[in-house]
Amino acid sequence: MAKGKRTFQPNNRRRARVHGFRLRMRTRAGRAIVAARRRKGRAKLTA
């Protein structure tokens, strides 16, 4: 069976821009995500 192409092509700049802290702080929903992760005690808040 033929498998599909590798879909994960790591790129640190894109990772930060799409999931990073500054992007999260931009929107109300993003700030809520960071707050929830702080409440839960996550070591990593964002990418």
From Swiss-Prot:
Intrachain disulfide bonds: none
Keywords of the record: Ribonucleoprotein, Ribosomal protein
One GO term (biological process): translation
GO cellular component: ribonucleoprotein complex; ribosome
Molecular function per GO: structural constituent of ribosome
InterPro entries: Ribosomal_bL34, Ribosomal_bL34_CS
Source organism superkingdom: Bacteria
Gene3D superfamilies linked to this entry: 1.10.287.3980
HAMAP family: Ribosomal_bL34 (MF_00391)
Protein family (similarity comment): Belongs to the bacterial ribosomal protein bL34 family.
Protein name: Large ribosomal subunit protein bL34
Organism: Corynebacterium glutamicum (strain ATCC 13032 / DSM 20300 / JCM 1318 / BCRC 11384 / CCUG 27702 / LMG 3730 / NBRC 12168 / NCIMB 10025 / NRRL B-2784 / 534)
Gene that produces this protein: rpmH
